């Protein structure tokens, strides 16, 4: 780990065991990345800052306590695997459901979950194919515009649940577009890794 990586790791405020699991995860991503493109090749050297810290920041915005966390379009496990790793220490009674339609990436997710001994279920399917999950928290990183995310998440959200959606600099236009189809009042939280990015926290939404 570089000096910057160590600073990120320290800021996560987790045990040495959890940090060790996150290091294992980072190694797995690098190992598999050449074959199935889990993250951009140019970001491999910044995996702690660009990916692990960026994913881990969602933990502080979660519902507490929570039972089920549903991660849509999990890809290489960002944020799902990172958050499930933190949960082994912070919320061991919780479970994570990761949805990824790409069979190769779903295989990676299962491998990572098994290697790290995580309470994770992986569905190699499209979100629309799943029965309602009644999730307490739903996340999705770099999956779709907010309008589409609302449509994907709504059938799976528990009555008192929440959604956490990281968004880039154009988040305001995404909110405006989504409000044409959805009644919602998202909380806007600044990203700790990118000054132009935010996390949108939605506690309730209803189709117009």
Curated annotation (Swiss-Prot):
GO molecular function: rRNA (guanine-N7-)-methyltransferase activity
UniProt subcellular location: Cytoplasm
SUPFAM superfamilies to which the protein is assigned, alphabetical: S-adenosyl-L-methionine-dependent methyltransferases
Enzyme class: transferase
Primary site of residence: cytoplasm
Chain positions recorded as S-adenosyl-L-methionine binding sites: 73, 78, 127-128, 141
Alphabetized InterPro entries for the sequence: rRNA_ssu_MeTfrase_G, SAM-dependent_MTases_sf
Entry similarity comment: Belongs to the methyltransferase superfamily. RNA methyltransferase RsmG family.
Record function comment: Specifically methylates the N7 position of guanine in position 527 of 16S rRNA.
Name of the protein in question: Ribosomal RNA small subunit methyltransferase G
Lineage: Bacteria, Pseudomonadati, Pseudomonadota, Alphaproteobacteria, Rhodobacterales
């Amino acid at each position: 780990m570089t000096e910057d990586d160590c600073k990120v790791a320290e800021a996560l405020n987790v045990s040495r065991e959890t940090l060790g699991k996150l290091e294992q995860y980072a190694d797995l991503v690098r190992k598999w990345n050449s074959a199935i493109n889990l993250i951009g090749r140019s970001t491999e050297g910044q995996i702690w800052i660009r990916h692990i810290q960026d994913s881990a920041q969602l933990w502080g915005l979660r519902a507490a306590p929570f039972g089920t966390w549903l991660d849509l379009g999990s890809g290489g496990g960002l944020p799902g695997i990172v958050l499930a790793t933190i949960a082994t220490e912070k919320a061991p009674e919780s479970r994570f459901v990761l949805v990824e339609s790409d069979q190769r990436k779903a295989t990676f997710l299962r491998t990572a979950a098994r290697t790290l001994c995580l309470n994770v279920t992986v569905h190699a399917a499209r979100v629309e194919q799943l029965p309602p999950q009644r999730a307490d928290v739903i996340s999705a990183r770099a999956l779709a515009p907010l309008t589409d995310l609302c449509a994907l998440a709504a059938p799976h959200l528990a009555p008192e649940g929440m959604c956490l959606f990281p968004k880039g600099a154009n988040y305001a236009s995404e909110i405006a577009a989504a409000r044409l189809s959805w009644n919602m009042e998202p909380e806007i939280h600044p990203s700790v890794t990118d000054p132009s990015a935010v996390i949108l926290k939605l506690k309730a939404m209803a189709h117009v």
